[in-house]
């Protein structure tokens, strides 16, 4: 059984993935709950899919990804 933190992560990530324009507040909350590199990479995959699927991705979304990528790349 998943821990409450893991369940929280999955639920919030699902909301972000399902919403065409997820709120900055919701993404901030998820980022505050990131506990593992795997979670960070999963979250980045969702954000990158959103950017890829949007003809005009928001600057805020692009900035968010650029801020998180170095964390995923660091050992």
What are the roles of these predicted feature ranges?
Residues 1-6, 69-75:
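Short acidic DE-rich linear segments
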Residues 2-34, 56, 63:
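N-terminal acidic leader/helix
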Residues 20, 35-39, 52-55, 70-73:
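Short alpha-helix boundary/capping elements
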Residues 29, 33, 47-51, 64-68, ...:
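Short, surface-exposed, charged/polar-biased interaction segments
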Residues 39-65:
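Short, charged early-sequence alpha-helical segments and their helix-coil boundaries
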